[in-house]
A protein has these predicted regions:
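A glycine-rich helix N-cap at a beta->alpha junction
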Residues: 89-99, 165-179, 374-386
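Glycine/charged-rich beta-loop-alpha catalytic/anionic-binding loops adjacent to active sites
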Residues: 32-39, 100-115, 137-143, 319-333, ...
């Protein structure tokens, strides 16, 4: 019986003590270890299984952490974490107080650059390489590992374009598996496919034309071949590029056959690969599905409706429309800047454009939102999925900045629905005709109405622009909520001893604010509490404070929301507790709120 090798590897120095012929066994053990832990603790499975051999080869050939290794996005970095001093606490991955699901500089010296968003690795590694040269270190290696979906993003090309005119000691490794979270799209994907199939002559190679020493494509699961090629490239100075071909989910049959589902499958059987299905009976719908079903229903009736997503057709549920109306629903790849300006161009031609981008990823297209959309007052409909705290993906993925970064933009309307009905109704209302851009923000996960699809779906009501509503009367304190966090207020008031003293107002329109109802609130209540699931600085509460100051009101105002710090990973409920906006914290607050 073979002895266990992985349990004796604490860091890459231990890995390098092994004979090369032992590394295949390490790969088998590492792949199985990832499967066993992720099957119970959840996480990003497929990407990490696909680069097991590459991970081992990199840490075996290069002198990490002296040589600097940057993983793009980080979905594929579980093997890297396990081999770099975190095997024993890998079971805490993505849990509150545990290790991050992504490389993180403050966590470990082997994590040279914090990642989570796409296409940053080449620029980061190039920056490190140029810095090393300026410091007189000409031997240090700088490696960027990037996927075929990420390299199609504009920022990756910017990095390649710069690197190609330097003599920086950088190695870019393209992990080509033809899929990101969803299948890769675009002309570059077709080009890479032709290269893999041997149909593209080497003299036409796009990477060689950028002055990189190009090699490949080679089998990314052939450890001896990988090691041999990395050793060869290590001796070459200047920009180098290695194209490897891998299979996402390698080593688990179901993950290889259903790569989208097994990107992050939840809990599953480590032996059979079967996903432990959760019963969805009597559960509310996911907000993403409310969007997906509603836009498809509206698009069937209105030929001007267009849907756009940057590489998130499944996660946004725009896939419903893409499957039925493919000519009017577009996955543009990991290209948020392009997605926004594409939407703007369509809007100039009187199309009704729903641009669905995760809140955290719209940050990548901020200039386009201002310059190409708002400045021209084009009626683009931004649907910001994953707004608020998203949970285990942590600080890189929380959608907590959108209210603050959008509220300052002229012409921009911001709407945060309380529930599924408000979401479908605002999606309906905007296609009736608007003369300004609007951002509709809603969270990851499920709503609050189990019977929405049967009782409410398709029964549309027009929403009046800028109107807030009183959900509950009170005598002493007014609670003003923006968005789905208002459901925590509703639940807390059911259990608060002095609920009769507390009024609740739903401000779905964060911009423009309902000044009429605000004026009534400030004249009626001495104390006002605002609550949001975004940052407090510059958010909804700040807008209420600005109204108060400009109208010379002296009321006591308490702002609840996300504090001025980056919130780490954990369940949404755990993170809401940290920010004191969960139901229990609100019950405690309301119990003292009228004193």
């Amino acid at each position: 019986m073979k002895s266990d090798l992985l349990s004796n590897i604490y860091n890459p120095a231990d890995l390098r003590l092994l004979k090369e012929e032992q590394l295949t066994q390490v790969a088998q053990e590492l792949r199985q270890f990832i499967i066993e832990v992720v099957s119970v603790k959840e996480g990003h499975l497929g990407a990490s299984l696909g680069v097991v051999e590459l991970t081992i080869a990199l840490h075996y050939v290069f002198n990490t952490p002296e040589d600097l290794l940057v993983w793009d996005v980080g979905h594929q970095a579980y093997g890297h974490k396990i081999l770099t001093e975190r095997r024993e606490n890998f079971h805490t991955n993505r849990q509150i107080g545990g290790i991050s699901g992504f490389p993180k500089r403050t966590e470990n010296v082997y994590d040279t650059f914090g990642v989570g968003h796409s296409s940053t690795s080449i620029s980061a590694a190039l920056g490190m390489a140029i810095a090393s040269k300026l410091k007189g270190d000409f031997d240090k290696e700088h490696i960027a590992v990037i996927g075929d979906a990420s390299i199609a993003s504009g920022m990756a090309f910017e990095g390649l374009n710069h690197a190609g005119v330097t003599d920086a000691n950088i190695l870019v490794i393209l992990n080509d598996n033809a899929i990101g979270i969803d299948p890769s799209v675009g002309a570059l994907k077709k080009y890479l496919t032709s290269v893999k199939n041997g149909k593209n002559p080497r003299q036409n190679n796009i990477i060689k034309s950028l002055n990189f020493d190009y090699s490949g494509p080679i089998d990314g699961h052939d450890l001896p071949k990988l090691i041999k090629e990395l050793k060869r490239l290590k001796k070459i100075k200047g920009p180098k590029f290695l194209h490897i071909v891998t299979t996402k989910g390698k080593g688990l049959q179901q993950a290889e056959e259903n790569q989208v589902k097994y990107h992050a499958p939840g809990k599953f059987d480590a032996l059979t690969g079967e996903i432990h299905l959760k019963s969805e009976e009597n559960l509310p719908p996911k907000y993403q599905d409310v969007f997906g079903l509603t836009i498809l229903d509206l698009a069937r009736k209105n030929e001007k409706i267009i849907g756009i997503t940057p590489a998130m057709p499944s996660g946004s549920s725009l896939k419903f429309m893409m499957d039925e109306l493919p000519d009017r629903a577009f996955d543009v790849g990991i290209a948020e800047q392009h997605a926004v300006t594409l939407a703007a161009g369509m809007a100039t031609q009187d199309m009704i454009v729903y641009c669905n981008i995760y809140s955290t990823f719209l940050q990548r297209a901020y200039d386009q939102v201002i310059h190409d959309v708002a400045l021209q007052n084009l009626p683009v409909i931004f649907c910001l999925d994953r707004a608020g705290l998203v949970g285990e993906d942590g600080a890189t993925h929380h959608g907590v900045f959108d209210i603050a970064y959008l509220r300052s933009i002229p012409n921009m309307v911001i709407y945060a629905p309380l529930n599924e009905i408000e979401l479908q109704n605002i999606l309906y209302t905007v296609q009736l005709g608007i003369d300004h851009p609007i951002a509709i923000r809603y969270p990851r996960g499920r709503g609050v109405l189990p019977n929405w699809e049967v009782e409410n779906f398709g029964h549309y009501q027009k929403i009046n622009l800028g109107e807030a509503k009183c959900l509950k009367d009170g005598t002493k304190v007014a609670v003003l909520s923006a968005g789905t966090i208002g459901n925590n207020v509703i639940e807390a008031l059911k259990e608060s001893a002095n609920a009769d003293e507390i009024a609740h107002y739903n401000f779905s329109f964060i911009k423009p604010l309902d000044h009429s109802i605000l004026n009534t609130i400030f004249l009626t209540f001495e104390k006002i509490i605002t609550i949001e699931d975004g940052v407090k600085n510059g958010g909804f509460g700040s807008a209420v404070l600005e109204f108060s100051a400009s109208n010379n009101f002296k009321n006591s105002i308490e702002i609840l929301g996300i504090p001025d710090e980056f919130i780490e990973h954990g369940t949404v409920n755990q993170l809401q507790q940290l920010c004191k906006i969960d139901v229990k914290s609100l019950i405690n607050l309301f119990s003292n709120g009228s004193k």
